[in-house]
């Protein structure tokens, strides 16, 4: 299998599972994507910020333990981001509270941007920069994707210039089709939308593909969408057709649903 250089930029957090909050896991869209790409055998680099605290040390350790390069992990004054999560009996998660901590306001430094330009593909997670990094990478000719679903503020959800725009429509087929249309007309070259238990769709405007889910015994869905993104990106950049890329994302997402957290890790105390 060919190995590629991937970067994931943006959010990290400590997922605190309720009730009560007695155990925690390292997570976040960009972190989870980076870890899953590394676990697939690729070179993965994480670009983001942590606090100078115990939670920041947990994030750094989680990345290193999974082979993700932390050369561009920055420490800032303030707390590491955290999320309080409740899990339903069916394994679905409810985000009770989010504190973005030092992830808020993070921007790659000039030297970081030069490093990003050397990557085969860059994925952006939650990033409150008004789309500045997306536009700069696109103008530099870098393949870049972003998960629009984790960026709630309108200023941060543009798709123009994206090689791949990812989104989530729940199980609403009509909304999924609208998102595909909006991403493509908005300037993304490829649109990929997950539909929960109904699977996923992808289209580049000329070719469309769909995939169902892989049934598993669900323990926790946290990070399943991030794993889907990693699996899809890795397959797509290797030249696999849209349908096969969706299947790769589906299979990795299904595996993630069989354990707690966005990637296999031992729980840590709060």
What is each residue range found by the language model?
Residues 138-210:
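Conserved phosphate/ATP/ADP-binding segment of small-molecule kinases
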